[in-house]
């Protein structure tokens, strides 16, 4: 039975908020904080990507944590292992909850990120973040062989989770049933797909085993962002049963 949207008019319970990541794909911290504040009753995780981090740096992470969000630092680190390790260490010391590292460079590269972010958090007296391996971007078409190989890299490197499209979840869960799965490209039915080649509805993603849904333009560029957030929270609640 569909959840009653009116139950979520003032916000969503933590069990739903913790599974919804708000993509703050803007280039200034003032705008990011304004958007985040307005939608915080429904979203418990703030995604700080390359655009916002390039504009505001560590301040973006610190501001979102200070405002009460978990931070998903979506930086897709891809460099030599030493550099990845050092960058991840910095992000861990800032208190991020999630950090993305690209799987393309292989196990050593991923392991450097896993160890770096954990060491940075430990040195700062903070809980260990979840290092997420980026598999195949949702703006790309999937290659099954590459996907399976990259999921294997995630497991071998000790990553706590990965980022994949909803359409890849069945493959991912068969190989790595216990990792945290983060799914971007979420679009409620009837909303444009923008540049996402493999979008999914919240219902479909949850049913396929997604743990965290990343939602950006479907809410931030909606005619009524609050109404869009309420609808998504209600849809997730229905999917969770």
Where are these regions (language model features)?
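C-terminal helical cap(s) of enzyme catalytic domains, especially alpha/beta-barrels
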Residues: 110-119, 219-241
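Glycine-rich phosphate-binding active-site loops on the catalytic face of alpha/beta enzymes
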Residues: 94-106, 168, 188-189, 198, ...
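Structural motif
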Residues: 41, 67, 94, 157, ...
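Conserved anion-binding
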Residues: 16-18, 79-182, 186-191
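Short, acidic/polar
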Residues: 27-38, 82-90, 143-153, 196-204
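N-terminal amphipathic alpha-helix/helix-capping segment at the start of soluble metabolic enzymes
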Residues: 1-35, 122-128, 170-176, 200, ...
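Generic structural signal for hydrophobic
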Residues: 38-39, 64, 91, 154, ...
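Conserved beta-strand positions in the central sheet of alpha/beta enzyme cores
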Residues: 21, 44-47, 72, 100, ...
């Amino acid at each position: 039975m569909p959840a009653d949207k009116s139950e979520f008019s003032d916000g969503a319970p933590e069990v739903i908020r913790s599974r919804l990541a708000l993509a703050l794909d803007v280039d200034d911290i003032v705008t990011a904080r304004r958007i985040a504040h307005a939608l915080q009753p429904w979203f418990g995780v703030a995604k700080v990507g390359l655009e916002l981090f390039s504009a505001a740096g560590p301040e973006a992470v610190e501001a979102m944590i200070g405002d009460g969000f978990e931070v998903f630092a979506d930086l897709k680190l891809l460099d030599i292992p030493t550099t990845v390790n050092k960058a991840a260490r910095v992000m861990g010391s800032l208190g991020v909850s999630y950090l993305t590292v690209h799987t393309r460079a292989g196990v050593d590269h991923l392991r450097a990120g896993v160890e770096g972010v954990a060491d940075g958090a430990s040195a700062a007296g903070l809980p260990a973040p979840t290092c997420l391996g980026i598999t195949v971007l949702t703006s790309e078409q999937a290659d099954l062989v590459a996907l399976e190989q990259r999921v294997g890299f995630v497991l071998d490197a000790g990553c706590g989770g990965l980022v994949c499209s909803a359409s890849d979840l069945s493959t991912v869960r068969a190989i790595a049933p216990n990792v945290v799965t983060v799914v971007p490209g979420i679009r409620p039915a009837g909303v444009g797909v923008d540049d996402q080649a493999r979008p999914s509805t919240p219902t479909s993603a949850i049913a396929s085993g997604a743990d965290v849904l990343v939602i950006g333009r479907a809410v931030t560029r909606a005619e009524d962002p609050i109404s869009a957030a309420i609808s998504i929270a209600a849809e997730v609640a229905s999917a969770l049963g």
